[in-house]
């Protein structure tokens, strides 16, 4: 069971994060509760999107406005059916997997890759200078 412990989400965009979407039931339950509490937009994010019960439920909830986007990584197979959904965003992790493999092959530390603080500060500096962020 899920118990809501936060403050008001009314009018706010909310991000639901979990390690895995198997059937998706738990995330859908949370999304329904957030919409009941008048969240403006609901985004579902997961590392591994398995969608073991198919996409019908996600299609329905997207069409009814209960979820706005679903984001998962390409660390597991993504069907063409999933990739074609208007609400689905593929988070490409290829670059990071390649960097991890490269660091391991060169006996280098992974801490720089795993700690995002430096990258965040560099992006903020670019933003402050008015540069385009890609």
Predicted regions mapped to residue ranges:
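PRPP-associated nucleotide enzymes
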Residues: 1-134
